[in-house]
Amino acid sequence: MNLELLESFGQNYPEEFDGSLDCISLAVTCAFNKYGTLLAVGCNDGRIVIWDFLTRGIAKIISAHVHPVCSLSWTRNGHKLLSASTDNNVCIWDVLTGELEHKYRFPSPVLKVQFDPRNDNRLLVCPMRYAAVLVEVGGTHRCLPLDSDGDLNIVASFDRRGKHIYTGNAKGKILVLDVETFEVVASFRIIVGTSSATAVKSIEFARRGDAFLINTSDRVIRVYDSKEIITLGKDGEPEPIQKLQDLVNKTTWKKCCFSGDGEYICAGSARQHALYIWEKSIGNLVKILHGTKGELLLDVVWHPVRPIIASISSGLVSIWAQNQVENWSAFAPDFKELDENVEYEERESEFDIADEDKSVDLNADAQQDEEIEVDVQKVEPVAAFCSSDEEGEDENALQFLPMAPEVEDPEDGWTGQDGLEPSAVMLGHMEPHDYEDDIMASKRRRMQLYDVSLPDAPTDETHPLISSKASKDKQQPVGGKKAAGRTKK
């Protein structure tokens, strides 16, 4: 898809349901890569399914974890994928080969993981009821400093360029920390009314611009300008650019995100499968997308460069897009569209081989356009894929995964013993089983395991993803024998 040829006028947000992606197992969370060509979906059985979003087909399946995957994050170039599961494990995967490179075991449940937007060797981990942890890949880890009130319900996120980390707690206090020194650059508190504070549930940054949003427990989404926050410094009192909420239903928000260009904000309801879309500049509600009734929303992500939203509910990934209208006049300006059949009247000498009535134009040669050399070798960078501080695209970025055709009836000699390629076994001086052992040994050497020690970390906590499922299973059906029985006195 050539992004330069897409319709850039009119509304830039999805309007209708455009199909679903079935991962066979139940989908829990998802994340787009930077280019929007690959969609990683974390499933309930621990697998990560990577979809080719252009063909809407499965490109790769990684058997990542044993427990459900709760968070995913891509590197900037798309070669690495970060995943966290409900068994307190955080893993870094090579997307091209599907191999595990690094594994971190935490003592407490992990709620969110995120790669540094500009540094593939740095990641942010948010454990449950503990300070956020900044991990250097293959090196050390550091805990982010807490506010003076010592609240441990921390949410954290990198800013767009990875220079600062924004943290928020249950008392509405926001800290802006320098990534290198952990120095508090700015801080402010979200206050409802005159004195009461509200808990911070999530912090999300736009891919373009300096805006970021804070989802709080008072059911209001506040949009701020990061430049203004840093300018005001410590204990500032910034005013939000917009306050977004559902005034009618007082909806609580499960997940919020920006559009690829940062001009729209999407929020998913925590009570039903409904997506609310606002325009950031003026704050008006432009669209509500309704899914199947009775479904609960788990995750929402916006495509990085196109007006497409992916939402997860009932184990399926729902795709929301614009209604595509065919515009044939865009290819032929003189093309005339008809609402009904019309008998065509041939013009005089229209289909003649030689037009006898054509007048001779003496100035035809002079009116011809000058010849222009067209450069077919130089590849111009696509503006949608480049940041404001970049001159061009990353040539080493991974946008697509190679696919191999499945051969139903392979010819003789196509594969060796145990399904191995003949070149791997026949050309070497080893048996097939020795070759398999060599592969397993190299994978073990390549994968590095780390036990992250967090002092006084809560080890008896249950991940919210598991506890919510357990509470649903314990609910008794209405009208059962226990409900119909008489209460004892």
UniProtKB/Swiss-Prot annotation:
Entry's Gene Ontology BP terms: chromatin organization; heart development
Question: Which GO cellular component term is one of those annotated?
Answer: MLL3/4 complex
- State where it is primarily located: nucleus
- Where does the protein end up? Nucleus
UniProt function note: Component of the SET1 complex that specifically di- and trimethylates 'Lys-4' of histone H3 and of the MLL3/4 complex which also methylates histone H3 'Lys-4'.
Which InterPro entries does this UniProt record tie to the protein? RBBP5/Swd1 (IPR037850), WD40/YVTN_repeat-like_dom_sf (IPR015943), WD40_repeat_CS (IPR019775), WD40_rpt (IPR001680)
Instruction: Please give the residue ranges the record annotates as the region Disordered.
Output: 451-489
How is this protein organized at the quaternary level? Core component of several methyltransferase-containing complexes. Component of the SET1 complex, composed at least of the catalytic subunit Set1, wds/WDR5, Wdr82, Rbbp5, ash2, Cfp1/CXXC1, hcf and Dpy-30L1. Component of the MLL3/4 complex composed at least of the catalytic subunit trr, ash2, Rbbp5, Dpy-30L1, wds, hcf, ptip, Pa1, Utx, Lpt and Ncoa6.
Q: Where are the WD repeats?
A: 22-63, 64-103, 147-187, 195-234, 248-290, 292-330
Species of provenance: Drosophila melanogaster (Fruit fly)
Report the PROSITE patterns cross-referenced here: WD_REPEATS_1, WD_REPEATS_2, WD_REPEATS_REGION
Which keywords fit this entry according to its UniProt record? Chromatin regulator, Nucleus, Repeat, Transcription, Transcription regulation, WD repeat
PANTHER family cross-referenced by the UniProt entry: RETINOBLASTOMA-BINDING PROTEIN 5
Is Transcription there in the keyword field? yes
Q: Which Gene3D superfamilies match?
A: YVTN repeat-like/Quinoprotein amine dehydrogenase
Gene expressing this chain: Rbbp5
Q: Does the keyword Nucleus apply?
A: yes
- Protein name per Swiss-Prot or TrEMBL: Retinoblastoma-binding protein 5 homolog
